[in-house]
Amino acid sequence: MFDIVTSYLNNLTRPYKLYVSLVDGFYTQEDIEKIKKYKTDVKIILVENKGVDIGGFLRAFKEVDSNTDLILKLHTKKGIGLPENPSALVRRRGMEVSLGHGRQWFHGLMKGVLSDEARVNRILEKFQNDKNCGMVGYKLYNNSKINQNEILKLCPLFGLNETFLDKTFVGGTIFWVRYNI
């Protein structure tokens, strides 16, 4: 999967720091060496398999240099859940359909933030020219009601009220974001 990610990362032609969170015990030493070979100054952070799409990012964020301006948050998205807890799509449509859907979703998200050098430059210029721009992703969604119960549990932790459910969000947890947001 890292080969696919690097095909998109190659569209980043400006200097950047690469932080990679990997589930501890899930990846081989060969996998880790492949990442190190791609970018020798990579910072690899081993994390627990906890927090779904965002847990590894939150753990890795603690390692990010505070002088960082922008973060590009990526992850390998499959949309199939775990063997002991398959996604709703796997339960409804089966593994093959779910894997196809996951691939399509992943590539759509990646193209939204890294499709080519021109798109990357447009995104970076947007951040540079619009100080109110805090986040850029593939598409905005407003279907928070699907996860309403989980969101309501988290709202007090972040000082948010229930009106937060009516807001839009960047889907797929693949996005550019200002470090200080």
Question: What are these language model-derived features?
Answer:
Residues 1-181:
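ER/Golgi luminal nucleotide-sugar-dependent glycosyltransferases, focusing on the catalytic module
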